[in-house]
């Protein structure tokens, strides 16, 4: 009996060792690429991205490798966001989450059943490194809303850019609760970092993204999007024991809008939306810009507002219009003449006895024509003698 137990324990120990090896091993599908190339070959993962330069959409796409982005929340929206940025060749991704992958997450995109039980940041880092080994992946497995961890989060986003000691270029919020959004808002206001807030509604049929520039646009404490759009208190949305709905379609669309605007900001092309919503029921995409609240509860937001107001505002360029006296069209086949607005209008001479006072005819009516006279005139013009109708009938019968 003891021998069988020892054998089982040995098998269990062997399986544990194998499992740990699988957890720590990272698959590398290809060698790292030092420089992006626009060469159109099957082995170049960046050829389709670099084509944006050839089509004059982006001036220098390779600058994306100099950018560092922090993603807070690696769930339905955050994991897809990280996947898209990795495929786009971002320089560095910093992932924050403290949750684990569960089978209940499988209705969303990105994660697979064999990753159940792993921390989300660990599972994401393995998959992303396999997709694109050129991207630097940094993970942080803790809750940013606690006092101790908030300080670590604050330091990380302010000093963990690609250059040591430099802040990240952009922060993307993909969390699902009010407290985490407020923590990100406070950290970005304090560090004066631009960031995107994103979210999907509890019923899974609407989403939004909001680009927040401290001092210039409303921060999350100034006007939370759901409070503005639907008059809902966001603190009531995340409730214990209540299962929120989720659709991979809504998650994917929201993540796509988020990454699209992040790329436009990082690579300086197109127009970045300050607020962009999505309603899946009628495919409605509202846009708006929210001004900061002068009485915001966040003291760093008020400080950034003062700094923004003190900056010299760019002057609008006035374009001088060149006015030419020459006619726009030299030819005038139709004899059209331009008349000044103050030119006198010729009055019609038509009899207007039946027209009410203060009115005039729009055109001159033709004179009434006597049909009998016109017929007789036609006969004369035809050179025929004037003959009565009875004579004509008699002539026809005699023929």
From Swiss-Prot:
GO terms under cellular component: cytosol
UniProtKB keywords: ATP-binding, Metal-binding, Nucleotide-binding, Ubl conjugation pathway, Zinc
Gene Ontology MF terms: ATP binding; metal ion binding; UFM1 activating enzyme activity
Domain of life: Eukaryota
Gene Ontology biological process terms, A to Z: neuromuscular process; protein ufmylation
Alphabetized Pfam families for the sequence: ThiF
UniProt key word Cell cycle: no
Active site: 243 (glycyl thioester intermediate)
Listed PANTHER family: UBIQUITIN-ACTIVATING ENZYME E1, UBIQUITIN-LIKE MODIFIER-ACTIVATING ENZYME 5
Protein name: Ubiquitin-like modifier-activating enzyme 5
Organism of provenance: Drosophila mojavensis (Fruit fly)
């Amino acid at each position: 009996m003891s021998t069988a137990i020892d054998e089982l324990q040995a098998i269990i120990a062997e399986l544990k060792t194998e499992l740990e090896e699988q957890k720590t091993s990272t698959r590398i599908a290809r060698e790292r690429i030092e420089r992006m190339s626009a060469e159109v070959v099957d082995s170049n993962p960046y050829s389709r991205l670099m084509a944006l330069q050839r089509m004059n959409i982006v001036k220098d796409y390779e600058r994306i490798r100099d950018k560092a982005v922090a993603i807070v929340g690696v769930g339905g929206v955050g994991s897809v966001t990280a996947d898209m940025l990795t495929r786009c060749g971002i320089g560095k991704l910093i992932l924050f989450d403290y949750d684990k992958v569960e089978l209940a997450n499988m209705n969303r995109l990105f994660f697979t059943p064999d990753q159940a039980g792993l921390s989300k940041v660990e599972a994401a880092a393995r998959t992303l490194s396999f997709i694109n080994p050129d991207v630097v992946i940094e993970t942080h497995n803790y809750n940013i809303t606690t006092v101790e961890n908030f300080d670590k989060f604050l330091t990380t986003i302010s000093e963990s850019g690609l250059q040591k000691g430099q802040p990240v270029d952009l922060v993307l919020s993909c969390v699902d609760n009010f407290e985490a959004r407020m923590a990100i808002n406070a950290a970005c206001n304090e560090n004066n970092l631009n960031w995107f807030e994103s979210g999907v509604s509890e019923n899974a049929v609407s989403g939004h993204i909001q680009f927040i520039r401290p001092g210039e646009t409303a921060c999350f404490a100034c006007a939370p999007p759901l409070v503005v759009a639907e008059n809902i208190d966001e603190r009531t949305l995340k409730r214990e024991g209540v299962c929120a709905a989720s659709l991979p379609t809504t998650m994917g669309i929201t993540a796509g809008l988020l990454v699209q605007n992040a790329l436009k900001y990082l690579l300086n092309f197109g127009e970045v939306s300050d607020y962009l919503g999505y309603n899946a029921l009628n495919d409605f995409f509202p846009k708006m810009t929210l001004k900061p609240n002068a009485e915001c509860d966040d003291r760093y937001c008020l400080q950034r507002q003062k700094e923004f107001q003190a900056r010299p505002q760019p002057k609008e360029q006035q374009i001088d219009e060149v006015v030419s006296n020459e006619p726009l069209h030299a030819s005038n086949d139709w004899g059209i003449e331009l008349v000044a607005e103050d030119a006198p209008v010729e009055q019609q001479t038509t009899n207007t006895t039946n027209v009410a006072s203060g009115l005039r005819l729009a055109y001159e009516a033709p004179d009434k024509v006597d049909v009998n006279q016109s017929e007789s005139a036609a006969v004369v013009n035809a050179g025929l003698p004037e003959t009565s109708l009875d004579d004509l009938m008699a002539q026809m019968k005699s023929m």
